[in-house]
């Protein structure tokens, strides 16, 4: 009679099993710590403020309400913010990826003269910034205030992303370029037609980072953009939360400052969901590239 093949876990020594179980328990707790707040925010955005305050989360749908979503989505400025945020994020991502990849390539070449000097210059900028006031004066003198370029250009280049891309380039065998040169490929042909297609994971990773960073950004827009028609989504949502004044009819229904505060709390949850939803939809499509890019960027220092 054939004996059943032991599982990999059963073959492990007792000490390894204990460590593995502890690791899974810690991982499970970590996952719960991430998932539970998200679930709470999603459910709380649909529950009327008073039942939520009195009895907490409930699955009694009679107590659920779309008031917060109706209020936020009925604001015409929210759609302008969505459009602006999408345009800014896409343009910023494209500019950032192009600049980063072009800067990382020569820095990955050991035969590039001045490589160490530029490395030092780049690293210095990671620790010392220009400061808010000097940057504002510079952007003002360049005539970029209240323009899209004020939020696209200053942060388009990231030294950290450049280092990750450089590390990825350095992990690609030099033989690949030598073979391309034998076939008559120029430096430009090698970079655009051979190297970049191999770098899809790191490109997707950098693009994801930059897109998320710009999508969630509001401070630069608050400083440099004065026109309401140019405000991104996060700034619009921030304004809604700060003002959080119900419509006149809603005030007469609730008739108290406490009710307005409860509505503001409900609006807070709804705005979190509205601002995060596009990223939640996008992330699964980039996850495989994101994981590969992170691992590839960590191979070398």
Language-model segments: which ranges?
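A hydrophobic, multi-pass inner-membrane permease signature
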Residues: 2-301
